[in-house]
């Protein structure tokens, strides 16, 4: 599974690079960047992709394979992922939501990118951290597509009890297999089931446990009225892992946000979703 977290995936029509950006003392996050080989496409402003909790690149390969030939793409992996380089003992507070937006801002600063010129695409935790960062003035944007954002991270009672207990490392493999089984049961879409299984099996479980303990306490602010980034919230009714009513509540709270419904969560990971992405960006004058 190490190959999931290293190397710059080479995609047709673009030059690829991988690098790490120090976002806090002893913590660096992995960044992938593609620049189209076509000079006209390469001159466009970048789209920045922030994937979800524990998400691996392979889940996004179908979309990015097409997208990287059209414009520069920057793909930022958040610090809970196995790819991040953390050279000290990790703590629960390292993975609190408040850090993630500043991490993304640090990456843009390193690359010399003004967040106000960015077209964002994000998913799940990636979408949640951007909403919080927009509200707090940490990041701006020209446009933002938010796939299945989480206003909170609601765990079942048994999981909340388990997360409060010390979990010995020798239990980790069994716990991971159990988690994969549970996700398989809860997920209606086959493509989504495959992606989650692959992502879960590729994780550093210690980091994911600490991240879960941080996320279980998190609630998106009720007041999102300070957001000035034009936002489209994307969702699929077949996505049983993200509460549609909570997603709709986010749409209502973000000024002038629009809802974009897609056929499935898997569709949002495929090249076909570029139709919806580019339609929204065109509608706001991009």
Where on the chain are the PLM-derived regions?
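Short beta-strand/loop motif that positions the catalytic acidic residue
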Residues: 227, 233-235
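Conserved alpha/beta-hydrolase "acid-adjacent" motif
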Residues: 240-246
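Active-site loop/oxyanion-hole signature of alpha/beta-hydrolase fold enzymes
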Residues: 75-121
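Catalytic active-site module of serine/aspartate enzymes centered on a nucleophile-bearing elbow/loop
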Residues: 256-286
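Alpha/beta-hydrolase fold catalytic core
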Residues: 1-47, 70-71, 280-286
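Conserved HGGG/HGGXW glycine-rich cap/lid loop of the alpha/beta-hydrolase fold
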Residues: 27-86
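Flexible "cap/lid" loop of the alpha/beta hydrolase fold
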Residues: 131, 135, 141-170
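Conserved alpha/beta-hydrolase catalytic His-Asp/Glu region
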Residues: 155-157, 172-225
């Amino acid at each position: 599974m190490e190959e999931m977290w290293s190397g710059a995936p080479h995609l047709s029509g673009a030059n690829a690079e991988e690098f790490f950006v120090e976002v806090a003392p002893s913590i660096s996050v992995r960044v992938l960047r593609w620049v189209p080989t076509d000079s006209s496409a390469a001159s466009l402003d970048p789209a920045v992709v922030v994937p979800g909790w524990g998400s691996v690149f392979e889940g996004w390969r179908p979309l990015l394979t097409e997208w990287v030939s059209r414009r520069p793409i920057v793909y930022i992996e958040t610090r809970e992922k196995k790819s991040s380089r953390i050279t000290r003992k990790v703590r629960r507070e390292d993975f609190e939501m408040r850090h993630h937006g500043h991490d993304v801002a640090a990456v843009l600063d390193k690359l010399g990118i003004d967040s106000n010129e960015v077209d964002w695409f994000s998913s799940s935790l990636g979408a949640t951290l951007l909403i919080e960062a927009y509200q707090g003035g940490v990041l701006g944007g020209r446009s933002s597509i938010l796939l299945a954002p989480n206003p909170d991270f609601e765990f079942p009672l048994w999981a909340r009890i388990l997360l409060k207990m010390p979990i010995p490392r020798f239990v980790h493999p069994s716990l991971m297999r159990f988690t994969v089984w549970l996700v398989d049961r809860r997920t209606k879409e086959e493509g989504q089931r495959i992606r989650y299984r692959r992502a879960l099996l590729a994780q550093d479980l210690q980091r994911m446990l600490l991240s879960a303990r941080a996320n279980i306490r998190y609630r998106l602010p009720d007041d999102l009225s300070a957001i000035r980034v034009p936002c489209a919230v994307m969702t699929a009714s077949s996505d049983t892992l993200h509460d549609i009513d909570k997603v709709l509540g986010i749409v209502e709270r973000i000024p002038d946000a629009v809802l974009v419904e897609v056929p499935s969560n898997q569709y949002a990971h495929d090249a076909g979703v570029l139709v919806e992405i580019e339609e929204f960006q065109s509608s706001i004058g991009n």
